[in-house]
C-alpha cells in the first residue's frame, strides 16, 4: 500500500505502524513530531497501524541561535 511521507510517496506493507515507518526511513526516536492525516500523533500512539493513502508529516526539531 502507499502512504505519503513529507510529500513523497512511500510503498509500505499492510499493518505497518507509524513507529515501523519512522524506523525504516531512518528518523531519530527523539526530537521529532509526527502528524498523520493532519492530526498530531503523541508518541504513545506510534504503534498505530497506518491506513492506505495516509499522509504522514514528520517535523525534526532544529536547535539554533
Regions found by a protein language model. Name each.
Residues 1-64:
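Ubiquitin-like/PB1-type beta-grasp interaction modules and other compact soluble beta-rich domains
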Amino acid at each position: 500500500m502507499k502512504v505519503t511521507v513529507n510529500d513523497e510517496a512511500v510503498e509500505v506493507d499492510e499493518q505497518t505502524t507509524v513507529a515501523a515507518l519512522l524506523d525504516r526511513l531512518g528518523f531519530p526516536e527523539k526530537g521529532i513530531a509526527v502528524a498523520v492525516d493532519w492530526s498530531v500523533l503523541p508518541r504513545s500512539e506510534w504503534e498505530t497501524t497506518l491506513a492506505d493513502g495516509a499522509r504522514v508529516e514528520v517535523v525534526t526539531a532544529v536547535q539554533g541561535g
